Every structure is written in structure tokens, then in C-alpha cells.
Amino acid sequence: MSVCAVLLLCVAGLLCLSSACYIQNCPRGGKRALLEPVSRQCLACGPGDKGRCLGPSICCGEEIGCLVGSPWMARCQEEEYLPSPCQTAGKLCGSDAGPCAAPGVCCGTEGCKLDPNCSEDSESEEPADQNTLGASPGELLLRLLHPNNRKHNQY
């Protein structure tokens, strides 16, 4: 082989092994755009799109409470197929730093649970078994998970 052929093969080999951004495979925003994931708001869900998806089967909002496993969750299934992660609004709570999904409810990777840090007035002192609505935490969670009963049950 001639020196030109060997040199050409070496250059071709280096081009194949390099991690440069070429015209064919360059992502939008350039090579460094992959380092900074774009955060977006989670998809809207629930009646009147008043909630946000917190998982494939959880939809929570201040006005609707938390809906788990209801027909309104079809939109939340789409979240898994979107390329960028979503970010929920609200302060972080719980052991896995999930978001406050609704007043008094913290949702994380393992599901949702009652959390006094998520109440609207978390600075006020309340007895552990009663809240300002006059219901036990269990009753409050049931009311949040079943918002259709709100018309009949007044706080």
C-alpha cells in the first residue's frame, strides 16, 4: 500500500472514533445542548385540565384534589413517551423530595401520602389528629381523592 492510502485510512478511522458533532447527527442547539435538559411543565389532566400529571396514573390539582387511576389519566400515559422530563410546580416534600400535589398531600415516586408541610398554612400549629377543616387526616385524604363528593360534604 502506498503512504497516501495508509494516511487516508488513518484519517477515516479517526473520524469514525471521534465524538464530534457532524452535520448528519448534530442535535438541535449543538453538541452541548444535550448537557442541559429542558424542563417543562407536566401535562395538564383532570376535569377541565385543572390538574397536572404526577405519574402515569396520578393527577393532582388544588381545585380537584388527587385523582388516582381514573379515566382522566389517559393523558398522563403520554408523559412517559415525551423526550424531556417534566417539572411540577409547588414546594418539595417527603423523604424522596416529591412535590406538594394538593393541600395536605405530598406525591413521590412511591405514591401519595398526607403531609402537613403541604398544607396551605403549614406554619400554623394544629393538633396532630385534627386539621383546620375539622376532619381527621384519613377523612381529608378521602375527600381529596374523591372530589365528586365535595358537593355533598361541606368542610
Swiss-Prot record:
It is found in: Secreted. GO terms for cellular component: extracellular space; secretory granule. The modification Glycine amide is found at residue 29. Its main location: secreted. Pfam families: Hormone_4, Hormone_5. Residues 119-139 are annotated as: Disordered. Residues 1-20 form the signal peptide. Disulfide bonds join 21-26, 42-86, 45-59, 53-76, 60-66, 93-106, 100-118, 107-112. PROSITE patterns: NEUROHYPOPHYS_HORM (PS00264). Keywords: Amidation, Cleavage on pair of basic residues, Disulfide bond, Hormone, Secreted, Signal. Gene3D superfamilies: Neurohypophysial hormone domain (2.60.9.10). GO terms for molecular function: neurohypophyseal hormone activity. Vasotocin is an antidiuretic hormone. PANTHER family: ISOTOCIN, NEUROPHYSIN. Belongs to the vasopressin/oxytocin family. This is Vasotocin-neurophysin VT 2. It comes from Catostomus commersonii (White sucker).
